[in-house]
Amino acid sequence: MGWSFIFLFLLSVTAGVHSEVQLQQSGAELVRAGSSVKMSCKASGYTFTSYGINWVKQRPGQGLEWIGYINPGNGYINYNEKFKGKTTLTVDKSSSTAYMQLRSLTSEDSAVYFCARSHYYGGSYDFDYWGQGTPLTVSS
């Protein structure tokens, strides 16, 4: 009886470790003005197609700016008007990875960019897990 309890306990602990939600973002980028960059956000520990992925910008000393949202399940994308034409959001379901491409880069694009998971809510996004952030520096 004791051994079976220990086995079940260890099994549940192991399952918990493997199911930990993580959003792992690509590393820091240093790019020239006028160029493009594509950063990634690899999800693990949950069903990728059951939650949305948001992208958020934070410039030094400033607040968070929501860039946009993509639903990996059906491909729906919602952009902040300010970032339309600047940003393209995509996903690769086979690798549970979300991507954000930024083009025509200027010094104003230098910032840390975060991905964040959210539930599907019409018109509002409840972020529950965040990536560690990808710093982007645009040099002239």
Curated annotation (Swiss-Prot):
A GO biological process held by the record: immunoglobulin mediated immune response
Domain Ig-like: 20-139
Signal sequence annotation: 1-19
SUPFAM superfamilies (UniProt xref): Immunoglobulin
GO molecular function terms attached to this record: antigen binding
Keywords: Adaptive immunity, Hybridoma, Immunity, Immunoglobulin, Signal
Coiled-coil blocks: none
Keyword Cell inner membrane: no
Keyword hit for Signal: yes
GO CC aspect terms: extracellular region; immunoglobulin complex
The protein's name in its UniProt record: Ig heavy chain V region 93G7
Annotated organism of origin: Mus musculus
Taxonomic lineage from the root: Eukaryota, Metazoa, Chordata, Craniata, Vertebrata
